[in-house]
A protein has these predicted regions:
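A charge-rich, low-complexity, intrinsically flexible signal that marks solvent-exposed coils, linkers
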Residues: 1-63
């Protein structure tokens, strides 16, 4: 999968297991950390169950 899809998988996993992102945004020099933080932060407000279902649907679509 491409990077955007991998970030979405990461974000949905974090949202399903941890909930809304409350972590401090990584510094400008940490491009990977910032991309992951932004992806997770875009899921803010999504319930754990919804995030789990979206994660499953996305993984199944890759098969």
């Amino acid at each position: 999968p491409d990077n955007a899809t991998l970030l979405k998988i990461y974000a949905l996993y974090k949202q399903a297991t941890t909930g809304d992102n409350a972590d401090k945004k990584p510094g400008f020099g940490d491009m990977v950390g910032r991309a992951k933080w932004d992806a997770w932060n875009n899921c803010k407000g999504t319930s754990s169950d919804d995030a789990m279902q979206q994660y499953i649907d996305l993984i199944e679509s890759l098969a």
